[in-house]
Amino acid sequence: SASTQRQALNAIVFLYKNVLDIHLEDKITPARSKRTASPPTVMTPSEVQRLFAAMEGKPALMAKLIYGSGMRLMECIRLRVQDIDFGQNLIFIRGGKGGKDRTTILPQNLRDEMFRQIEAVKSLHHNDLEEGFGDVYIPEALARKYPKASRSTGWQWVFPAKLRSVDPR
């Protein structure tokens, strides 16, 4: 493959230049193989519909949200209640790929389902608080400035885990 050939060539160039102290750049110009750019594999709309039809519950909502908004999987998993803006149909993605923040759309056809999911999260959070739980991880600086923020509804995960766990910190 192209990457294997490039790695071997770079190893030889390193050997000659840094170990043997022979500079080959002036004497030879090796032919470098190019990577072949393959087009991405994309599902047809009918395949997507069949996939969604085979799913149900929270995984189906997550898949539809990822597909409809262009989010990455971990961005969806890390989504918090306060990151959903129903007024402007926006989703705020914090700390996405490359640590960057960005904004994407909340698909119109998922508004009601997302609203029900957030209402379920609020109810679950209320029950957790009554039982002495309900804290979520928040950035340390924020936790110092607002000690009770980790218990607020806005910081709760939109798609919480099924099992309750306690943050060891």
Question: What are the residue ranges of the model-derived segments?
Answer:
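Conserved catalytic core of the tyrosine transesterase superfamily
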Residues: 1-169
